[in-house]
Swiss-Prot record:
The lineage of its organism: Bacteria, Pseudomonadati, Pseudomonadota, Gammaproteobacteria, Moraxellales. One of its GO terms (cellular component) is cytoplasm. This is Thiazole synthase. Catalyzes the rearrangement of 1-deoxy-D-xylulose 5-phosphate (DXP) to produce the thiazole phosphate moiety of thiamine. Sulfur is provided by the thiocarboxylate moiety of the carrier protein ThiS. In vitro, sulfur can be provided by H(2)S. Its EC number is 2.8.1.10. It comes from Psychrobacter cryohalolentis (strain ATCC BAA-1226 / DSM 17306 / VKM B-2378 / K5). The keyword Protease does not apply. Homotetramer. Forms heterodimers with either ThiH or ThiS. 1-deoxy-D-xylulose 5-phosphate binds at residues 176, 202-203, 224-225. Belongs to the ThiG family. PANTHER family: THIAZOLE SYNTHASE. It is found in: Cytoplasm.
């Protein structure tokens, strides 16, 4: 997001460093998913440890009231405590994604904040940009606040923002790959140009990946596999919380310039012994 490129002053406490998505404002810049955990208990414990405020839910794969005979995720992740972010994971065309968002709005009593993802194929889970653009327009016209999963193409990101998407969510690398941020330069271009929040979505594997995303100037990071697939998900959730915080603080502080040659830390004059 372009207005985040200046460094913070000492009069800007990090505790007051919020960000706004559509009509909602948040303090935690870590967003988490709910899939791949071994059970509901682990899901709740890990999400609690992350201190996330936004929790994303795959409507086509997770019961949030569609089936009264199955455990309801909302019994563990309460909408009274978290902002539930329905997503369209598993959708491969605009029509299915639109229908899924409308179902989510019905199940959540008119909730209009959604995460749109329209996938290209099952092997890469790379975004289908054309179908994403098509779905985004319909949803925005229908009153949804759309956070959108997309490629790392700065031109596509600008188009989605121009359409009215409230957050741009470029992938760091393939969903669930844990490969980290393979595209830092293009991510930086998206961040510099954007006037809405930019959040890395997909590819984070460990805490350093999250910190790097925030150091680049991202407004937040969304992850699921990096926590759920860890040997200790609750501990990893805590690590990610601290990594996002540290990366954001480093960005606001302003890193030192990179130099090709050494620069001594101590003065080069006034030696005791010549």
């Amino acid at each position: 997001m372009s207005d985040n490129t200046s460094t913070a002053t000492q009069s800007t406490p990090l505790l007051q460093d919020t960000f706004t998505v559509g009509s909602r404002t948040f303090s935690s810049r870590l967003l988490v998913g709910t899939g791949k955990y071994k059970d509901m208990t682990e899901t709740g414990a890990a999400i609690g440890a992350s201190a996330a405020e936004i929790v994303t839910v795959a409507i086509r794969r997770t019961n949030i009231g569609q089936n009264s005979n199955e455990p309801n995720l909302l019994d563990v992740i309460s909408p009274d405590k978290y902002t539930i972010l329905p997503n369209t994971a598993g959708c491969f065309d605009a029509e299915t994604a639109i229908r899924t968002c409308k179902l989510a709005r019905e199940l959540l009593g008119g909730h209009n904040l959604v995460k749109l993802e329209v996938l290209g194929d099952e092997k890469t889970l790379y975004p289908n940009v054309m179908e994403t653009l098509k779905a985004a327009k319909v949803l925005i016209d229908d009153g949804f606040e759309v956070m959108v999963y997309t490629s790392d193409d700065p031109i596509v990101a600008q188009e989605l923002e121009s359409m009215g998407c409230v957050a741009i969510m470029p992938l760091g690398s393939l969903i669930g790959s844990g490969l980290g941020l393979l595209n830092r330069h293009t991510l930086s271009l998206i961040i510099e140009n954007a006037k809405v929040p930019v959040l890395v979505d997909a590819g984070v594997g460990t805490a350093s990946d999250a910190a790097i995303a925030m150091e680049l100037g991202c407004d937040g990071v969304l992850m699921n596999s990096a926590i759920a697939n860890a040997q200790n998900p609750v501990m990893m959730a805590q690590a990610m919380k601290h990594a996002v915080w540290a990366g954001r603080q480093a960005f606001l502080a302003g890193r030192m310039p990179m130099r090709k040659m050494a620069t001594a830390s101590s003065p080069q004059t006034g030696y005791f012994f010549q």
